[in-house]
């Protein structure tokens, strides 16, 4: 089985497809363990973010696609048009580019590297990684560090979190006059909330499944932040001007009916809603309501492209470095694959040496001269070492030109 990657991202699939193939964080350990023990793969790492779902494996790409469709209970024909299946060298290049932020919606964004490290950690804990994937990701992290150190690809990067504030400022003139509600208390919400907190909104509320985690985030944000439970949302939604949601829920948390009731109480005051979750936390139909401004991760593209031109120049240098590192890694892996063959070849040579040496010792014992024995030994050793290659070439003739060329290369006869 070969190294391969199967997946889809913001470039190949819309949000409506990506959310169907997303893996919930809580389900990821069992999923990656299942994949690595299936007929599809012997090693596996699953990367699932708001912009991509990718399965890095040692296995058969077609079987991996089938496993992915079965896992999410989807017809394979429905997802196949959006998927890419990469061979070994393409997989290496793709992993390097993703980790460096070269394949991100926000060119050069740093969060993806942490997300890959989390995916690898989960796979290691589930013992779903072997020599090939360990080697790939060890090199991936090294390349990502080198690219970010030696190039400017990540400089002036507009993150999804900072873009959230920019988008809100296009609707409301002063964030300081607003009440902001954050649904969820994970890494993305913490990043977004930190940017909003810097603008000193009138009130910030963190709604979460557990009050303790919500309080923990509020403590980081400052005095004007308060916690609440998700179950409180229907009663308080109308009090907020901005709602940002990013949870791991597999079903919508905020429905159209809940927003309709909140808008009636707001009396035509606009409600800005940003859904950064995949699958979505807010029902898509909310976007049809008057005075509700609903945005998803796919709507953020234009905003996060700010400064892209400068980063693209740096990206050219990064791509060159990535290409060099891909070639280096592939050579290393091919060299490692040759080790058993090299050992077998040397073992055969040693076997032939011992045989002719044994014959030579017998000849000397019978009284043959050293010159005669050495001459006979050299002829026998030459014949033994060249017998198999000569026989194979005679059988191949000129039809197998690759074999002929390979033998010429091995013995340096192609100069």
Curated annotation (Swiss-Prot):
NADP(+) binds at residues 184-189. PROSITE patterns: GLUTR. Pathway: Porphyrin-containing compound metabolism; protoporphyrin-IX biosynthesis; 5-aminolevulinate from L-glutamyl-tRNA(Glu): step 1/2. GO terms for biological process: protoporphyrinogen IX biosynthetic process from glutamate. The keyword S-adenosyl-L-methionine does not apply. The active site is at residue 50. It comes from the Bacteria. Keywords: NADP, Oxidoreductase, Porphyrin biosynthesis. The keyword NADP applies. Gene3D superfamilies: Glutamyl-tRNA reductase, N-terminal domain (3.30.460.30), NAD(P)-binding Rossmann-like Domain (3.40.50.720). One of its GO terms (molecular function) is glutamyl-tRNA reductase activity. It catalyses: (S)-4-amino-5-oxopentanoate + tRNA(Glu) + NADP(+) = L-glutamyl-tRNA(Glu) + NADPH + H(+). Catalyzes the NADPH-dependent reduction of glutamyl-tRNA(Glu) to glutamate 1-semialdehyde (GSA). Possesses an unusual extended V-shaped dimeric structure with each monomer consisting of three distinct domains arranged along a curved 'spinal' alpha-helix. The N-terminal catalytic domain specifically recognizes the glutamate moiety of the substrate. The second domain is the NADPH-binding domain, and the third C-terminal domain is responsible for dimerization. Homodimer. NCBIfam families: hemA (TIGR01035). This is Glutamyl-tRNA reductase.
């Amino acid at each position: 089985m070969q190294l391969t990657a199967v997946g889809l991202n913001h470039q190949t699939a819309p949000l409506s497809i990506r959310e169907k193939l997303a893996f919930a964080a809580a389900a990821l350990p069992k999923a990656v363990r299942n994949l690595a023990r299936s007929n599809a793969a012997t090693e596996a790492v699953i990367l699932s973010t708001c912009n991509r779902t990718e399965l890095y494996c040692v296995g058969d790409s077609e079987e991996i696609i089938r496993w992915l469709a079965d896992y999410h209970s989807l017809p394979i024909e429905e997802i196949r048009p959006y998927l890419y299946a990469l061979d070994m060298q393409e997989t290496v290049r793709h992993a390097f580019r993703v980790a460096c932020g070269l394949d991100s919606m926000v060119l050069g964004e740093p969060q993806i590297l942490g997300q890959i490290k989390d995916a690898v950690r989960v796979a290691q804990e589930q013992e779903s990684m072997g020599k090939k994937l360990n080697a790939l990701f060890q090199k991936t992290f090294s390349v990502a560090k080198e690219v970010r150190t030696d190039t400017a690809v990540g400089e002036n990067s507009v993150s999804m979190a900072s873009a959230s504030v920019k988008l809100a400022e296009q609707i409301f003139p002063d964030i300081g006059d607003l009440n902001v509600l954050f649904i969820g208390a994970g890494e993305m919400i913490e990043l977004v909330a930190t940017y909003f907190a810097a603008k000193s909104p009138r009130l910030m509320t963190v709604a979460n499944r557990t009050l303790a985690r919500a309080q923990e985030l509020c403590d980081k944000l400052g005095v004007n932040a308060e916690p609440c439970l998700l179950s409180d949302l229907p009663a308080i939604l109308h009090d907020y001007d901005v709602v940002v949601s990013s949870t791991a829920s597999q079903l919508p948390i905020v429905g159209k009916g809940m927003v309709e009731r909140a808008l009636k109480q707001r009396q035509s005051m606009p409600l800005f809603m940003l859904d950064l979750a995949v699958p979505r936390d807010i029902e898509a139909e909310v976007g049809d309501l008057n005075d509700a401004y609903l945005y998803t991760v796919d709507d953020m593209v234009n905003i996060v492209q700010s400064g892209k031109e400068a980063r693209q120049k740096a990206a050219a240098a990064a791509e060159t470095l990535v290409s060099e590192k891909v070639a280096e890694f592939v050579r290393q892996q091919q060299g490692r694959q040759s080790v058993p063959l090299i050992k077998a070849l040397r073992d055969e040579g040693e076997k032939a040496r011992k045989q002719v040496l044994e014959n030579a010792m017998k000849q000397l014992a019978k009284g043959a001269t050293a010159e005669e024995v050495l001459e006979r030994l050299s002829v026998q050793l030459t014949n033994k070492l060249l017998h198999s290659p000569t026989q194979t070439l005679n059988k191949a003739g000129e039809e197998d030109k690759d074999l002929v060329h390979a033998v010429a290369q091995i013995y340096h006869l192609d100069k």
